[in-house]
Amino acid sequence: MKVHGMMILAGAALVAGCSGERPELEKPVAAGDTIRFSAGPCFGVCPSYSLRVTPDGSGLLEPERFTSVPGATRFTVTPAQYRRFRSALAQFRPVAGTVKRISSGENCTRFATDMPGYTIEWTRDERPATRLEFQSGCMDASYGKLRATIAAIPRMLDIDAMVKPSAVR
């Protein structure tokens, strides 16, 4: 009975050690926004992941499906890459502290189903987050530049090899 109890305790300790704590980035020292970008799933083989980049250049990629990294992966960006990322997204940023949603039936007339959704979130200190939610099935011409910017993010941050599925799986 004693051995059985010890095995239960050992198993509980192992499970507690694998509790799946979410990796976090250090709080940035440099002033600026931490930008989170999430690519949601589609009804196909679209890479699904979330990433965060701080103004200090720290990045964290958290894969969900169809990426070439098996788990949370840290990366760094140069100050120029961070500025380019921030500037490319600035034109789509909603009013500070608000959420803007671009989706079928709300502000999109031409919509294709089964496409991934994207979320871009800007946070700084304790201020309320600013968030843009974009359903990429929205094919309105007015959102063409947003679609192109989203498609360029992996190259912009030099993580395209991490978010594309490997050729052999």
Give the predicted meaning of each segment:
Residues 26, 31-69, 73-74:
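N-terminal secretory signal peptides
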Residues 53-57, 76-86, 122-128:
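A short, structured loop/turn motif at beta-sheet edges
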Residues 1-16:
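Sec-dependent bacterial lipoprotein signal peptides
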Residues 54-58, 72, 80-81, 95-96, ...:
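Short, low-complexity, polar/charged sequence segments that are solvent-exposed and flexible
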Residues 5, 18-43, 94-169:
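Short, well-ordered, aromatic-rich surface patches in folded extracellular/luminal domains
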